[in-house]
């Protein structure tokens, strides 16, 4: 009987507290705001199309810009990171002053018009030059062997360095998980003899370093792999229309 009375008393206290809270809120002490219909066009913060961070002119309502960094740009010499040139090209100081935010994608292979690599020469040599040079439908370039254990180890170090440099001040709002495949989009044109993207166990080794390096940042994937759901990641697409 005592337990029943105690439970009833607790319920009564909760009801009275809720009623008092509602009375306080409805009396005008709460934080209320009434919006009016408008035909005005206004920006949607941190959403939608993001212009490149190197653009000189962006509209005032833009709050989000896009920055990609190739491994060749990031680490031209082993353990030496080219922060100054990266920040200058992407106008980092400007965007910080203007209160903008960035999307970051790390890329190891961007097809182009001429033969080239988007990983540094030292890494190419350290991994035994075991990737694939290609010249096909997408363009020309070099596709690393993403199963290479040395490549995976060095990738983890590079992501850690990115997190230590860019992951402390809130500038980066989104990470587009790149690293693998053409344009960092987790696919390759294997019909031209390029080694396929690795199986799940290896792919995940390219994901976990990002979770540790940028713990408070929204993360996006190009493909709906299982791990995206497990860690609450969104999806991105470079196309419109």
Residue ranges and their predicted role:
Residues 23-29, 158:
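N-terminal membrane-anchoring alpha-helices
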Residues 1-13:
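N-terminal Sec-pathway targeting helices
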Residues 30-147:
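N-terminal substrate-binding region of glycoside hydrolase catalytic domains
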């Amino acid at each position: 009987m005592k337990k029943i009375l105690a439970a009833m008393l607790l319920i009564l206290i909760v009801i009275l507290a809720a009623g008092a809270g509602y009375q306080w809120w409805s009396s005008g002490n709460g934080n209320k705001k009434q919006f009016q219909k408008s035909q005005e066009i206004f920006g949607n913060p941190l959403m939608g199309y993001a212009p490149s961070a190197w653009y000189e002119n962006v509209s005032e309502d833009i709050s989000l810009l896009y920055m990609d960094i190739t491994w060749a740009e990031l680490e031209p010499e082993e353990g030496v990171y080219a922060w100054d040139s990266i920040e200058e090209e992407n106008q980092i100081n400007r965007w910080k002053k203007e209160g903008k935010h960035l999307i970051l994608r790390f890329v190891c292979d961007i097809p182009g018009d001429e033969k080239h690599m988007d990983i540094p020469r030292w890494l190419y040599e350290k991994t035994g030059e075991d990737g694939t040079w290609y010249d096909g439908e997408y363009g020309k370039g070099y596709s690393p062997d993403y199963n290479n254990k040395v490549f995976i180890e060095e990738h983890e170090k590079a992501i850690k360095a990115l997190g230590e440099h860019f992951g402390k001040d809130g500038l980066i709002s989104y990470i587009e998980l790149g690293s693998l495949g053409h344009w960092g989009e987790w696919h390759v044109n294997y019909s031209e003899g390029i080694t396929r993207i690795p199986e799940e166990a290896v792919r995940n080794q390219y994901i976990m370093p990002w979770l540790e390096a940028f713990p408070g940042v929204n993360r996006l994937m190009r493909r709906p792999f299982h791990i995206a759901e497990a860690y609450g990641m969104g999806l991105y697409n470079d196309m419109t229309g």
